[in-house]
Design a protein with these regions (language model features):
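Ferredoxin-type iron-sulfur electron-transfer modules and their immediate structural context
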Residues: 2-126
Length: 126
């Protein structure tokens, strides 16, 4: 909800901060790939879960958010795809919009009704 600061918003801001820091520091696509693999551990440190049922789920969601922030597409859940796959196509000066504009990370979702927008105070923590 707008104006309410939550731990999910904090994680979101950390993801954008780290992606911006990576882009300003520059480097090759292999450097970006290595940094992308390390960022979930930097953003969600330690061994204790705080937002989800497992620390591994939290880091997987952060990893997916990093991919989306870098302009990469959402990975299919049914296939094993590396975090940095397709990165060489994203690390360019001009990158144009690829549909869809808004992505839903399915395994991060707590099963809110799809294709329905309702403003309530029943936040599911997505």
């Amino acid at each position: 909800m707008r104006g309410i600061y939550t731990p999910v918003i904090d994680v979101r801001r950390k993801v954008f901060t780290e992606v911006a820091r990576m882009s300003y520091q520059g480097g090759s696509s292999s450097d970006y790939g290595e940094q992308m693999r390390k960022l979930p551990y930097k953003i969600i440190p330690g061994e204790e879960k705080s937002l989800r049922s497992s620390i591994f789920l939290e880091r997987a969601i952060v990893s997916e958010r990093i991919r989306l922030a870098m302009g990469l597409s959402l990975r299919p859940i049914s296939q094993q795809v590396a975090t940095d796959e397709g990165l060489e196509h994203s690390v360019i000066a001009d990158k144009y919009y690829e549909p869809p504009l808004i992505n839903v990370i399915k395994f991060a979702c707590n099963r809110c009704p799809e294709k329905l927008v309702q403003v309530t105070d029943l936040c599911q923590g997505c």
